[in-house]
A protein has these predicted regions:
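Acidic, metal/cofactor-coordinating or nucleic-acid-engaging core segments within structured domains
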Residues: 87-146
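Conserved catalytic cores of phosphodiester-cleaving nucleases, focusing on short active-site segments
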Residues: 59-61, 66-74, 128
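Short, flexible loop/turn elements at secondary-structure junctions
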Residues: 26, 30, 43-45, 63, ...
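Basic, amphipathic N-terminal segments that precede the first structured/catalytic domain
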Residues: 1-57, 219-224
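Short, low-complexity, polybasic intrinsically disordered segments
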Residues: 146-219, 223
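Short, flexible/disordered intra-domain loops and linkers
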Residues: 85, 110-117, 165-176
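Acidic (Asp/Glu-rich) sequence patches and key acidic residues
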Residues: 56, 66-69, 79-91
Length: 224
C-alpha cells in the first residue's frame, strides 16, 4: 500500500492551485509566476474543521511516499531587522545624538517581531502534523492501515527575495560552512528541527525533515 489512497481522496474532494495562488498574501505572492500546483492545505483543514479551524500550512504536496507541507512566510525581509540593527537610525533631532532609550526599545521591538513570526511557524508545524495524523489520513484510508510515510515541512521565506547583498552573504556563508547566529536560515532550521524533528530521546518527533528556503532556492529545487 502506498500513498495512492490519500492522492485519490484529495483529487476527489479538492482542486489544486498554483504556487502563485498558494503563496499569495494581501494580494502579493512570494512565487511570482508558476504553473506548478499543489493542494491548498488551509482549504483541506477548513473542510475537516468547519468551525474552530486549527492553524495550518499553506500547501500539501505528495511525491511517491513523501508528504510535503509547504509554508510561505513573509515578514522576515525588512530594511531593519535584529541582525542588521543600526543604532545610527535612532538619532534624535532634539538632542542631535543617538537616543539610547529609543534604540533599546527599537531593538527589542525587532526581536519581538521575529519571535512572533517564529512562534506562528511553530504552531503551524505542530497543528498541521496533528491534522494530518489524526484526521486526514484516517479519513483517506478509512479502516485500512496507512503506510509509513515520510513527512517533510518546507518553510519558504522572503528573507533574501529583494536583497542581493543579503543573498550573497548567505551563499558565502554556505560555501565557507560558517555557522553563526547571523545565518538566518541556519537559526530558523535549528529552531524548528529542535522542536519537531528530534525529540529529547533522539528519536523522530513530528517530521522527518524541516528545511527553510529562500524563494530563489525553492523555485530552483521544487519548480524546475
Amino acid at each position: 500500500m502506498g500513498i495512492s489512497e490519500l492522492a485519490d481522496f484529495l483529487e476527489q474532494n479538492f482542486s489544486k492551485k498554483t504556487y502563485t495562488e498558494l503563496s499569495a498574501n494581501q494580494n502579493k505572492s512570494l512565487i511570482q509566476s508558476s504553473k506548478c500546483e499543489a493542494y491548498d492545505f488551509d482549504e483541506i483543514t477548513e473542510y475537516i474543521f468547519p468551525q474552530n479551524k486549527p492553524s495550518s500550512a499553506d500547501a500539501i504536496l505528495l511525491d511517491k511516499n513523501r508528504i510535503y507541507f509547504i509554508e510561505f512566510k513573509s515578514g522576515f525581509h525588512r530594511k531593519m531587522s535584529r541582525t542588521n540593527f543600526d543604532r545610527a537610525q535612532c538619532r534624535c533631532e532634539k538632542i542631535d545624538d543617538i537616543c539610547d532609550d529609543y534604540a533599546k526599545l527599537m531593538k527589542r521591538h525587532l526581536e519581538n517581531i521575529e519571535s512572533e513570526l517564529k512562534a506562528n511557524l511553530f504552531q503551524k508545524t505542530a497543528e498541521s502534523r496533528w491534522t494530518l495524523e489524526y484526521h486526514l489520513l484516517p479519513e483517506a484510508y478509512k479502516n485500512k492501515t496507512y503506510p509509513d510515510l515520510q513527512i517533510f515541512y518546507i518553510i519558504v521565506t522572503d528573507k533574501v527575495k529583494e536583497d542581493p547583498i543579503d543573498a550573497m552573504g548567505q551563499i558565502m556563508d554556505d560555501l565557507a560552512n560558517i555557522h553563526n547566529e547571523d545565518n538566518f536560515y541556519e537559526r530558523m532550521e535549528q529552531s524548528v528541527k529542535h522542536l519537531y524533528c528530534e525529540s529529547r530521546y533522539r528519536k523522530k518527533a513530528f517530521y522527518d525533515k524541516v528545511e527553510v528556503y529562500s524563494v530563489q532556492d525553492f523555485e530552483t529545487f521544487f519548480l524546475n
